[in-house]
Amino acid sequence: MFTFSSPRDRDRLLREIELLAAALLRLEYRIATVESCTGGSVAAMFTELPGSSAWFDRGFVTYSNAAKEDMVGVRTETLRDYGAVSEQTALDMALGGVVHSAA
């Protein structure tokens, strides 16, 4: 879950999400999230925006290594060699999110 030092910080992030949403709609793109340590907080913020189903496809919460492997196809070797919190694992998660969604 995101923590904000003030309500203004939260409002600022929601405005940024609105800008992202407008760009996605204009370009006719959809987005998906693949999260681990954030536990779905990014997807939760996206879905706070009315009409987000027009541009937000889905969110994967892959906290465990098994979830990373099962849901988005992160390779066991990647997790073994680089660890769950690594650039390589994040890249595999992002690619898997594209492959397993309509984004």
Please provide the spans of the model-predicted regions.
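Short alpha-helical segments enriched in small residues
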Residues: 1-103
